[in-house]
């Protein structure tokens, strides 16, 4: 985007003054016109992994001329981007690798690589157990894939790089390429909270925020390509502290997530902003103020609470009480009364009693969560919680999980039903998967909506009258204003 600048972006006054922004950089490597091979990527886990996989594809398209394929048998490079959150993640990875071993039959020079959090945990052990694996790389070293591939081909030896080079990953990625009207932008990596059950600090490292201006540049580049919705990503996204100002000879200042959202909202073309995943400890008044002041900030929040018992929250090392969590929700609903709130829950944490679980259900009732990601506790090696005694029968854990999910699902169904007859602002994402003659998009509270419409509307916001609530989606029709009637 030569000549494009974000230096004149207006900013809203906050506790931190926004910096003077520089022109957008040009000249980062782009995909060559010549396709020189095929790439297959299997992705497990969170939205951050989805983002990382997209960046792997961009890096290898730009440097190696690799084009994505849906069939690993057609690929010259096959990668699995792993997740270590759930139990037996390692075994699932080795099972996948065992199936891929046959791809090398007959001497075909296929490169097999393992990335993501399991790669960070296991490192050299992956190659020792599966010597046909060519590459092992962590979330922070995916940008080094071209060098790792070349080193593997030149040396004939497997390459392992699971280091934590902090922000270097973002400095060396190609310019972003839009793939539809909604895009993810990673604004930070890692987590420094060290919850007792979680492996993320050990697999992705401590919290490191991208510089404020770098994030704005990426968003502006995506907006110029037609992106209308930005999803800001981080393991603890609301801990964001993006540096700015040091280049002018002044001490660096730091923008929080609230200021970042305010500034992104003033980039031409950006009509909706989301962020995930948050930690309640970092849910600040600045962020509440952003919900009050920034209409582009979606009327939706995902804020993982994990449990409603203070005793269990303390054992999890979450750093807050159930009352403190509810206080933050009350502040938010004072400025956005109808906001939809989703959360994460861990059921059956070591030592959880019936009374503890009842407190979780009470919290769910008090807050009125719209959606949830809920799981039975999974012991992760190397975490403090893995040493705790766990004497709750599996059947009890299963029953608790079913009860929790049934309650939240019933509440969510009620919200969907009450949306019938309302008009919702929807970003048209593309044709419906169920009916190619219809369009699909999402409401602000993350509900898929299918409706008849002209394909030329893809990438635009439209008002949709909701006519029916189904189990996992809504149906509607485009609401025309009087001038279009």
From Swiss-Prot:
Binds 2 [4Fe-4S] clusters. One cluster is coordinated with 3 cysteines and an exchangeable S-adenosyl-L-methionine. [4Fe-4S] cluster 1 binds at residues 46, 83, 117. It is found in: Cytoplasm. GO terms for biological process: tRNA methylthiolation. One of its GO terms (cellular component) is cytosol. One of its GO terms (molecular function) is metal ion binding. It catalyses: N(6)-dimethylallyladenosine(37) in tRNA + (sulfur carrier)-SH + AH2 + 2 S-adenosyl-L-methionine = 2-methylsulfanyl-N(6)-dimethylallyladenosine(37) in tRNA + (sulfur carrier)-H + 5'-deoxyadenosine + L-methionine + A + S-adenosyl-L-homocysteine + 2 H(+). Residues 37-154 form the MTTase N-terminal domain. Residues 177-416 form the Radical SAM core domain. Residues 417-480 form the TRAM domain. Keywords: 4Fe-4S, Cytoplasm, Iron, Iron-sulfur, Metal-binding, S-adenosyl-L-methionine, Transferase, tRNA processing. Monomer. Belongs to the methylthiotransferase family. MiaB subfamily. Catalyzes the methylthiolation of N6-(dimethylallyl)adenosine (i(6)A), leading to the formation of 2-methylthio-N6-(dimethylallyl)adenosine (ms(2)i(6)A) at position 37 in tRNAs that read codons beginning with uridine. This is tRNA-2-methylthio-N(6)-dimethylallyladenosine synthase. It comes from Xanthomonas campestris pv. campestris (strain ATCC 33913 / DSM 3586 / NCPPB 528 / LMG 568 / P 25). The lineage of its organism: Bacteria, Pseudomonadati, Pseudomonadota, Gammaproteobacteria, Lysobacterales. The gene is miaB.
């Amino acid at each position: 985007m030569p000549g494009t600048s974000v230096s004149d972006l207006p900013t809203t006054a906050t506790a931190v003054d926004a910096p003077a922004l520089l022109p957008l950089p040009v000249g980062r490597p782009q995909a060559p016109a010549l396709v020189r091979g095929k790439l297959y990527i299997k992705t497990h886990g969170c939205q951050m992994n989805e983002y990382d996989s997209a960046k792997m594809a961009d890096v290898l398209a730009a440097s190696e001329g690799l084009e994505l394929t849906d069939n690993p048998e057609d690929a010259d490079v096959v990668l699995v981007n792993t997740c270590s959150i759930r139990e037996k993640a390692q075994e699932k990875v080795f099972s996948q690798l065992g199936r891929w071993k046959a791809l090398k039959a007959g001497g075909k020079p296929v490169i097999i690589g393992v990335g993501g959090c399991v790669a960070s945990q296991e490192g050299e052990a992956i190659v020792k157990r599966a010597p046909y694996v060519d590459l092992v790389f962590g979330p922070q070293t995916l940008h080094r894939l071209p060098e790792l591939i070349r080193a593997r081909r030149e040396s004939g030896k497997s390459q392992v790089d699971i280091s934590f080079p902090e922000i270097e990953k973002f400095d060396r990625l190609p310019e972003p390429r839009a793939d539809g009207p909604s895009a993810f932008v990673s604004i930070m990596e890692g987590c420094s909270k060290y919850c007792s059950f979680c492996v993320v600090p050990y697999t992705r490292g401590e919290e490191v925020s991208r510089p404020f201006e770098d994030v704005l540049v990426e968003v502006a580049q995506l907006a110029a390509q037609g992106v209308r919705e930005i999803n800001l990503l981080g393991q603890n996204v609301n801990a964001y502290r993006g540096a700015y100002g040091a280049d002018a000879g002044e001490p660096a200042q730091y923008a929080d997530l609230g200021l970042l959202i305010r500034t992104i909202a003033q980039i031409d073309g950006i009509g909706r902003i989301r962020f995930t995943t948050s930690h309640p400890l970092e849910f600040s008044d600045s962020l509440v103020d952003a919900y009050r002041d920034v209409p582009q900030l979606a009327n939706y929040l995902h804020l993982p609470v994990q449990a409603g018992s203070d005793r269990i929250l303390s054992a999890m090392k979450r750093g807050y009480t159930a009352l403190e969590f509810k206080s933050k929700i009350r502040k938010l609903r004072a400025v956005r009364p109808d906001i939809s709130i989703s959360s994460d829950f861990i059921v059956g944490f070591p030592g959880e009693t019936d009374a503890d679980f009842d407190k979780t259900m009470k919290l769910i009732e008090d807050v009125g969560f719209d959606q949830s990601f809920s799981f039975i506790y999974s012991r992760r090696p190397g975490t403090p919680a893995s040493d705790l005694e766990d004497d709750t029968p599996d059947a009890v854990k299963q029953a608790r999980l079913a009860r929790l999910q049934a309650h939240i699902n019933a509440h969510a169904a009620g919200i969907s039903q009450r949306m019938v007859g309302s008009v919702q602002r929807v970003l048209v994402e593309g044709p419906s998967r169920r009916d190619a003659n219809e369009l699909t998009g999402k409401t602000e509270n993350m509900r898929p909506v299918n409706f008849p419409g002209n394909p030329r509307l893809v990438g635009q916001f439209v008002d949709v009258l909701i006519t029916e609530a189904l189990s996992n989606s809504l149906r509607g029709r485009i609401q025309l204003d009087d001038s279009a009637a």
